[in-house]
């Protein structure tokens, strides 16, 4: 699909005429997002984000549209791009653009377009800069930090090590040629970032450890009501949705290999087992491996599993978990996909030399020299968003309620000294607040402690109920 832009408008989407359809789905999603909508209702009058200019880099879906409109309802000015080339829902992007929010996203972007769009979320039409980032995977944060370094040392962007870096480095060089101080100027204006996902959080901690991070960050991913719900229950529903839409395969009876048994892997394994697959798990961490074994999954290595599996799902956040040699040994018609954030969990670059036959968008047959074919979904990128529509609205409500609270927290405390440069998590009482708001939709009835019971276990009657180190 060719992207369409109206030069009189500050947006770029696939088809603005899809806005009506998108608006109808947004209205439905709002009814399934109780936590986020309650936050909107609670804070709308106070306008706690007034003055915030948020550069957003997160999957441009229907659920994200509800997040964007919540941020705006609380006073923020917002510009948006997707954090994945395949994850945009074009009708969602159209609805947001039609509503007056600058959005630069369409399904099936090239990598050149992706990095161009990520730059555009920092270019306010009045010539100003954003002062907050809402990130998913850390690309927006990375862009400013790397670009600012490259202003002083061009060698940092001289030798790309991957296709992704080739386009990223080229985009930075192009921007520097036009405006040599663009990155440092934008970087200096940012008061904080809230990060959505595990991969982006890893990047933040690495940057902080090296002393490279230039502004405070809130790790939204490790809020319990994000990681233990979005990552687990969201993947439990959206993984199989993506595989089914892409292939129409019967999962029952198949051997399914789940690489990684963190929260995403746990949800993925549950989903595949629920449809009667034989689920095998690969793990490096003995604790996670023991958890998998105690749940009845067979724990194996990828070297062993490669020639046995029918469906392969990577969820590790690591690099080359499935290699060329693994794929060369797979069965004919094996299905290979990823539900981790980046596309390098599967070594796609190593098989690009072979014949690719597109069955339909984001579904490819790759023919090996011996004539065997395997099915690659979403070119190794997020299968649930590339081949389906991602997590359900209800579970995203928890994640995005946390995002909104984190944006409010950083913006309100920007001058207080509460958050010097570093990586932080939201306090337990806010986690519990999000859970309470979500429970309303399910007609759940919480038991209340008596004063005596609260005193007996040493907590306040209204919570928080667990210590920060508690593992849910």
Curated annotation (Swiss-Prot):
GO terms for biological process: L-homocysteine biosynthetic process; one-carbon metabolic process; S-adenosylmethionine cycle. One of its GO terms (molecular function) is adenosylhomocysteinase activity. May play a key role in the regulation of the intracellular concentration of adenosylhomocysteine. Substrate binds at residues 61, 136, 196, 226, 230. It is found in: Cytoplasm. This is Adenosylhomocysteinase. It comes from Cupriavidus pinatubonensis (strain JMP 134 / LMG 1197) (Cupriavidus necator (strain JMP 134)). It comes from the Bacteria. Its cofactor is NAD(+). Pathway: Amino-acid biosynthesis; L-homocysteine biosynthesis; L-homocysteine from S-adenosyl-L-homocysteine: step 1/1. HAMAP family: AdoHcyase. One of its GO terms (cellular component) is cytosol. Binds 1 NAD(+) per subunit. The keyword NAD applies. Keywords: Cytoplasm, Hydrolase, NAD, One-carbon metabolism. PANTHER family: ADENOSYLHOMOCYSTEINASE (PTHR23420:SF0). It is an enzyme of class 3 (hydrolase). Disulfide bonds: none annotated. It catalyses: S-adenosyl-L-homocysteine + H2O = L-homocysteine + adenosine. NAD(+) binds at residues 197-199, 231, 260-265, 283, 318, 339-341, 384. It holds the Pfam family AdoHcyase_NAD. Its EC number is 3.13.2.1. Belongs to the adenosylhomocysteinase family. Gene3D superfamilies: Adenosylhomocysteinase-like, NAD(P)-binding Rossmann-like Domain.
């Amino acid at each position: 699909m060719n992207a369409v832009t109206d030069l009189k408008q500050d947006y770029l989407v696939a088809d603005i005429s899809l806005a009506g359809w998108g608006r109808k789905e947004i209205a439905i999603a709002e009814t399934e997002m109780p936590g986020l909508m309650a936050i909107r209702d609670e804070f709308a009058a106070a306008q706690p984000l007034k003055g915030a200019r948020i550069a957003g880099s997160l999957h441009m879906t229907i659920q994200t549209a509800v997040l964007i409109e919540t941020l705006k309802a609380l006073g923020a000015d917002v510009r948006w791009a997707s954090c994945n080339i395949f994850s945009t829902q074009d009708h969602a992007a159209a609805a947001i653009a039609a509503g007056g929010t600058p959005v630069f996203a369409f399904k099936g972007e090239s990598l050149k377009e992706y990095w161009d769009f990520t730059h555009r979320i920092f270019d306010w039409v009045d010539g100003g800069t954003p002062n907050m980032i809402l990130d998913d995977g850390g690309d927006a944060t990375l862009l400013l930090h790397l670009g600012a370094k490259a202003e002083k040392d061009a060698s940092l962007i001289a030798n790309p090590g991957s296709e992704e870096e080739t386009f990223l480095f080229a985009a930075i060089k192009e921007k520097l040629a036009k405006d040599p101080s663009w990155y440092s100027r934008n970087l200096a204006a940012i008061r904080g970032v809230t990060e959505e996902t595990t991969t982006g959080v890893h990047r933040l901690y690495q940057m902080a450890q090296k002393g490279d991070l230039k502004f405070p960050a809130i790790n939204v991913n490790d809020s319990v009501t994000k990681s233990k719900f979005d990552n687990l229950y969201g993947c439990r529903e959206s993984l199989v949705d993506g595989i089914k839409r892409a292939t129409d395969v019967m999962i029952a009876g198949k051997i399914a290999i789940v690489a990684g048994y963190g929260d995403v892997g746990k949800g993925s394994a549950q989903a595949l087992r629920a449809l009667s697959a034989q689920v095998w798990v690969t793990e490096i961490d003995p604790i996670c491996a023991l958890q998998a074994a105690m749940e009845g999954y067979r724990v194996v290595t990828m070297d062993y599993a490669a020639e046995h599996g029918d469906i392969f799902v990577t969820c590790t956040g690591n690099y080359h978990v499935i290699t060329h040699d693994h794929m060369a040994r797979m069965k004919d018609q094996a299905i290979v996909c990823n539900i981790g954030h980046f596309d390098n969990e599967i070594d796609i670059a190593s098989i690009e030399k072979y014949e690719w036959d597109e069955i339909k968008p984001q579904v490819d047959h790759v023919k090996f020299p011996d004539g065997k074919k395997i099915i690659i979904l979403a070119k190794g990128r997020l299968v649930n968003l590339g081949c389906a529509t991602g997590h359900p609205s209800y579970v995203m409500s928890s994640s995005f309620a946390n995002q909104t609270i984190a944006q409010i927290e950083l913006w309100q405390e920007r001058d207080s000294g509460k958050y010097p440069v570093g990586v932080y998590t939201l306090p337990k009482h806010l986690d519990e607040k999000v859970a309470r708001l979500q429970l309303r939709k399910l007609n759940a009835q919480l038991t209340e402690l008596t004063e005596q019971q609260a005193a007996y276990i040493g907590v306040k009657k209204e919570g928080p109920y667990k210590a920060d180190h508690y593992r849910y």
